[in-house]
């Protein structure tokens, strides 16, 4: 760990130094620190099928057709569906919605469900966060006489399914400008569709006697879906999240306010709250509860219903954590025989399909390799499994999954660079793991070689203050593609180190300036770093590295270090 030679004082312009060190040109600093929609928003018409989708929806609205929104069961799907439902309501249309059951129906549009919706009177179905690869299901829908518009962001194949329109910046035939927005979450694409739809209706004089909807009020949904889906926070996504957090802080959306209360968030939310507090609660509904809870919460106008759903989601999230811990332990036990594999493929019966994505993410973090966790069901040797994968930066897992499907190693599969889902026959597990190992070995090796810890600042302990956190927050929002700053603090002496909770390392450190601070490393009890600090010589000095957070549990807020690494300083 290179801690650098210069120790910064808070009198320095830390914010400017941080942005410049990350490659932001001086003339772009203000734009980066305060991203606006005006600066980053593209013309939605640049996206293929966008105008066709807007015109078809406008026609359905004007003629009074029955519209149904078909969403995925995760946060991106729930926020995308809620965005369109809210928009349609503001336009005077009561649209229905359908969220599939994760365990019974799996990911993506079900042909049977689409046909059933058609039989119930829907003449237009808009799928969000799913559908780009659903050839069979969308063929069934077409044969049933229902139009389907797909709004998605997942990887596409060259041959597209039959639709009335397919809006996806990751279409292989997309324009360069639209393709440059391939990092958008589905909710971001849905927001662009909302702009296009309002523009189309405006041209048809739809708003002569009706107020235009306030599209900016939808940005709280866009921010939540973007962060929770781990979309890269650069360009338009930065503007979405930055502006969306301002909307969220107003607590205008009843369901969001209830979710903030259930999460015990009293202050204005920041981007990490979306990913670690709000998002997991909504996801818990789709993972182990009712798939519709997220959409119901985000669209309700009843404060009591919102409070009840938010509390239910919080309880489900606690249950999810317990289930996840069991699967995590079992999955880690399988790692012993996979040290030489470039991709960790772990599978077993009895694992809850609702938590395998989270466990895959944990395994990825532990091994610094892409990980796929598969829940098998059925008879031995003849079972199928549903799998979820998470990748490391620089390794396109979604493309590899699509390639495996095209090689007939998978029943179904798709995704994007950082995450993927699949269905596989148990008999093909070994061949699938070998295929991924061969295809991705070089990419994984290159990506891991470039993952040396990057430090943004070097500080004396006295510089670790709440004011520093406030200063660094000004360069946010932080997330994938724009990580929270990592600082090195030292040299320090470890005053105390112990294990708290089940497996968290807690450290009290003191610097040569006489200032002390607290550091904590989550789920790190068995790591080499923890063992070194627990059994240190009291005379040794260390540099500690991690991210600075506010600890507001005590009577006075204090800065603490979320510890990621340590190195001897002497």
For each feature predicted by the language model, list its residue ranges.
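Short beta-alpha junctions and helix-cap segments that line functional grooves
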Residues: 110-113, 134-138, 151-153, 357-360, ...
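A generic local secondary-structure boundary/capping motif
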Residues: 138-139, 155, 178-181, 266-267, ...
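Active-site cavity-forming subdomains of large catalytic enzyme subunits
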Residues: 115-208
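Structural signal for conserved beta-strand scaffold positions within catalytic alpha/beta enzyme cores
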Residues: 150, 166-168, 223, 373, ...
